[in-house]
Amino acid sequence: MKKKSYYVLTLGTLPFAQANSITGAGASFPYPIYAKWASLYEKETGNKVNYQSIGSGGGQQQIIAKTVDFGASDDPMKSELLQQHQLVQFPAVIGGIVPVVNLPEIKPGKLKLSGKLLAEIFLGKIKKWNDPDLVALNPTLPLPNKNIIVIHRSDGSGTTFGFTNYLSKISNDWKNQVGEGKSVKWLTGQGGKGNEGVASYVRQMKYSIGYVEYAYAKQNQLAWISLQNQAGQFVQPSNESFMAAASHAKWHEKAGMGVILTNETGEKSWPITAASFILLNKYSDNPETTKNVLAFFDWAFSRGQDAATELDYVPIPADVVSTIKSQWKTELKQ
């Protein structure tokens, strides 16, 4: 057997001697910030990062197959899978999954929903926008006598994992009939590929409802809902409400820091907050490429945080970043 030696990263390995290119693929949830980071990084260093938004399932498959330099997933891999496939996992950014609607005359944040009502809509039990339960919660809104058009993801998706994980915590009917996962058997609705596809469908189709990462909602000028959290408060998606949820995370208790941030406590917490994770092969066939990937994320953690905040993502806390960098030194090998 070939002897394995530790791949040691120090800050001294990070300066950029010459231009290089790395490739990544996976979650569409963080695509807006990864694209922004890649643009800023290339301007500053000359190094290129090519990231393809193909969904978390595809990102996991491609890093396992070693067809990309890094994978990205919003559905954190469990300890046994990380060990089985000899992968290293760490969080890169935090954001929010938001239900969005296309209802004429109803502006962002005005429609109130509880988690239970949201589940019943996606189960197909609530079929009309003027359903009595929706009207009771929104007595002043002009809810139309129109069928609700449900839009969900058609691909393996970490955004779907976060959304269905939340609904499984809120609704026993959802947990028993649909459950959670990157791909589930939907009981109603039609599918769009990627956050991009869901956002496009909701934008085009009146009386529809879907779920996307918050940056996609803003970029597509979609109306998000006000969602009731565990504390009983109706909150809107924002950098602050995502940060409130993330403040309760116990990063160091999970393998690969794979925390789930849905339905967190706190009066200001957004109920469907999620971290997005990077996956690297522990044993690299090309140590120089691994070094280049780490250089990019080292740059993102130290110089890309303002860009993350501008796009309404939450940067990874400094103490967690310190742990991540220690993890790079001890777990990545060649």
From Swiss-Prot:
> Which InterPro entries does this one have?
ABC_phos-bd_PstS, PBP_domain, Phosphate-bind_PstS
Could you tell me which Pfam families the record lists for this protein?
PBP_like_2
Task: Enumerate the subcellular locations listed in this protein's record, separating them with semicolons.
Answer: Periplasm
- Which keywords has UniProt assigned to this entry? Periplasm, Phosphate transport, Signal, Transport
One GO cellular component term of this record is: ATP-binding cassette (ABC) transporter complex
Show the GO MF annotations.
phosphate ion binding
Per UniProt, phosphate binds at A27, S28, F29, S56, D74, S157, G158, T159
Please state the span of the N-terminal signal peptide per the UniProt entry.
1-19
One biological process term from GO is:
phosphate ion transmembrane transport
What does the function comment of this entry state? Part of the ABC transporter complex PstSACB involved in phosphate import.
Q: How does it assemble?
A: The complex is composed of two ATP-binding proteins (PstB), two transmembrane proteins (PstC and PstA) and a solute-binding protein (PstS).
Regarding protein family, the annotation reads: Belongs to the PstS family.
Q: What is this protein called?
A: Phosphate-binding protein PstS
Q: What organism is the protein native to?
A: Haemophilus influenzae (strain ATCC 51907 / DSM 11121 / KW20 / Rd)
Specify the taxonomic lineage. Answer: Bacteria, Pseudomonadati, Pseudomonadota, Gammaproteobacteria, Pasteurellales
